[in-house]
Amino acid sequence: MGSYLNPGSMLFRGSLRSKIYIDKSGLIEKINELVCTEQKYVCVSRPRRFGKSMAANMLAAYYKKDEDTKPLFDKLLISQAKSYEEHLNQYDVIRINMQQFLSETHNMEEMLSKLRNYLIMDLQEAYEKIRFREKTSLVQTMKDVFAYTGCPFIILIDEWDCLFREYQKDKEAQKKYLDFLRAWLKDQDYVGLAYMTGILPIKKYGSHSAL
């Protein structure tokens, strides 16, 4: 378990213990249909306080492979689905909140550098037996892990659009950010699912699309 790789399930457990909890686990069945398909890129655009983060926490708890979370889901709607046990606790999960990284740094370059370094640290600590080809490359590190495990990643990104909201006029920063997302996620066989949440709808920014 790392801070960003296969994080603990405490946030979802907290939701389950809440006095008011609405079972949204039916979403998992829909997402299971997309894992490792050409439709594996999902973006959920909703206003704040719409339960986007809770849903991402639920997906992280369901897919993460280093913890038995079956007791959390056995009484929920997803337990009735045919795909329930097929995907339960079967994947390496990367769970990040882009707003946290942006808030803790001073510019886009620093944000991306910190993100890369933290993810690489989690991955290389979890798979210390692997001989990594490029220890400073996030993409190559994930390729090396995938080649070793044969298990694709479930990547959950909260507040993916925060940079566009805070750097509305900085087109160069927006371009570099989209270039990073594209290089990291698009056409990579280590991606089993890329699930992103935000406020703004995905659209084309200048000559660049988000993915």
For the regions a protein language model found, what residue spans apply to each?
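Phosphate-binding site recognition
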Residues: 1-211
